[in-house]
């Protein structure tokens, strides 16, 4: 299943990450790292980067570590955990990504505050989703899923204190919502 997710999420991930303007040397976190594809993609976009991955699923952590075994504990660090309590210090990351995962985060507003906490001033949070209706059939099929529209996600980011929030769309179904942590002057 995780290899299938890596494959099916690749077009969305490749498109969405192009919108971020990833810089060399960044420290990045992929929340809900699944099978590890996004971690690999982030490393290709940023020379001398460090990429952290976190997933609540032990199976996902094992797969992501296997996919990234050649650089594990050098440039890549993967741990099991939740978006509700990220095991990282304040202001650690230049970029946090979430590809097709916010639907499963309990207490999304609280999780967004937690992401905000671990981002550096000026840091970016990119949420990549396939657009679904909030009353979608998926929420009836997939346990623990809450569907959000891009507009709902943008509002939640704004409420959490992100700035410059923007929705980018690629028809028919892809959306990337990016928010920035204000810089401290």
Where are each of the predicted segments found?
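Core SAM-dependent methyltransferase catalytic element
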Residues: 169-185
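Conserved SAM-binding loop of SAM-dependent methyltransferases across substrates and taxa
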Residues: 35-46
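Conserved class I S-adenosyl-L-methionine
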Residues: 25-34
């Amino acid at each position: 299943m995780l290899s299938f997710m890596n494959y099916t999420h690749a077009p969305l991930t490749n498109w969405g990450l192009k919108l971020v303007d990833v810089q060399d040397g960044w420290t990045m976190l992929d929340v809900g790292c699944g099978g590890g594809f996004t971690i690999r993609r982030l490393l290709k976009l940023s020379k001398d980067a460090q990429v952290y991955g976190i997933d609540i699923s032990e199976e996902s952590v094992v797969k992501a570590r296997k996919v990234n075994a050649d650089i594990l504990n050098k440039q890549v660090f993967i741990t099991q955990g939740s978006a509700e309590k990220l095991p990282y210090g304040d202001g650690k990351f230049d970029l946090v990504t979430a590809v097709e995962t916010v639907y499963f985060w309990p207490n999304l507003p609280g999780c967004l505050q937690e992401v905000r906490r671990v981002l550096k001033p000026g840091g970016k949070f990119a949420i990549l989703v396939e657009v679904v209706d909030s009353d979608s059939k998926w929420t009836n099929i997939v346990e623990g899923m809450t569907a959000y529209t891009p507009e709902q996600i943008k509002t939640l980011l704004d409420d959490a204190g992100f700035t410059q929030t923007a929705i980018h769309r690629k028809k028919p179904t892809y959306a990337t919502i990016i928010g920035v942590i204000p810089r401290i002057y």
